[in-house]
Amino acid sequence: MVRWFTAIRVRLRDLRQSTFFMNAFYLMLSTFIVAGFGFIFWVIVARGYSSTTIGLATTLLSVSGLLSMLSLAGFDTTFVRFLPKSKRPNDHINNGLVVVALLGVVLSLGFVSTLSVTSPSLIFVQHNGWYIFGFTFFTVATSLNVLTNAIFLAQKRVRDIFIINLLFSAFKVVLPLLIIHGSVMTIFVMVGISQLVGLVLSLGVMKVRFQYTFSPKIHGDIMRLTRKYSFSVYASSILNLLPPTILPLIIIHRLGSSSAAYYYIVFTIGSALYTIAYASMQSAFAEGSHNEAAMRNHILKATKLIGVLLAPAIVVVLAFSNVILKIFGSEYATGGSGLLRLFAISAVAVAACSALGAIFKVTHNLRGVVAMNIVYAAGILGLSYVFIPKFGILGVGWAWIAGTIAAAMVGWAFLKRSNSNYKLREG
């Protein structure tokens, strides 16, 4: 017995000394904290707002999320890949912050100007100057907050991400307790304020940790150095984000705002499963960016970690999906439990795509990562459009499973054909 406890203690000590496992642990914990507090946030909101109001708010948040991700222009992945060995980290960071902020403003205003065509249900935003300002401002704040996370990951300071996310997520939960009733924009602004708090905290920590100093100057030589890589990962990121952000628009158009609310809540919960794979492979990506020669070992470690954690998590969701969703109300359990189970089943294919994506980004297999995400986006969105009239909201889940499996198969084909230095089976 003593030997057994000693062995466990030694193993835990080894894990604490491994930057890969600690970064993966903090990434998972950070995402679970955000998801957990987000879960509480929506439980509170669901008690004070109608499902129609929540459906419109979640659609607006989804669009804002898409625009904030589009604003990143690939800088988040580029930071993780190039910052570790950069001799001018401040210039890299300032390039990213300035370009992302400017692009965020342009995209947000562009979207608002086309609401009558792209999303008539959100046209109310266009009719109020403060709504336009709030939508633009908080979309930019969200994109910059996400970008700062990439900076901490690149420097292997993931513990800071966890602390910052814990603080701004806790703050987010307090807001609906203070503002019990309101409109669609009330919900949107509450989420936006929490993102702004996270951004301010991140910039403060960057100043202390990395002696970061902001400058609005764009350094063209650095932009030219990374533009091909940035453009390719930007394209793949756009494709990867299209399904979760465009699906609410399809659902609200074909099934109504209540179904959009069910989808948003279900996907928020289902994303917690995907976090296991995403966090593990992001940690492998960060470690591989510091030391490409060790990439194979990190991928294998990540795969083992995913296997240990993901299987029981899937079983729990499959068994208790109805119970979980009843927390939001019986209508959510009735309307979304089947979809949640399908999202859980797709987690295995999502993990495979995450692993392949990490390999492609480190080895600069840019065609592979773009092709895989083309199949992913086209498969999920195209099949959802076909399946929804036949299966209702469950059609989204079946499309998600088929699309991710197809994407993983395409990614595997590119890996097998790759001439990069990384070979999955080589030691």
PLM feature segments, named:
Residues G129, F133, F162-F210, V375-G379, ...:
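Hydrophobic alpha-helical transmembrane segments
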Residues V2-R3, S18-D76, F231-S257, L381-Y385, ...:
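Signature of the first transmembrane helix
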Residues W4-Q17, R159, I163, I187-F188, ...:
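Interhelical loop/hinge segments that connect adjacent transmembrane helices in multipass membrane
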Residues N23-G38, L167-S169, I187-F210, H219-F285, ...:
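Transmembrane helical elements of multi-pass membrane transporters/channels
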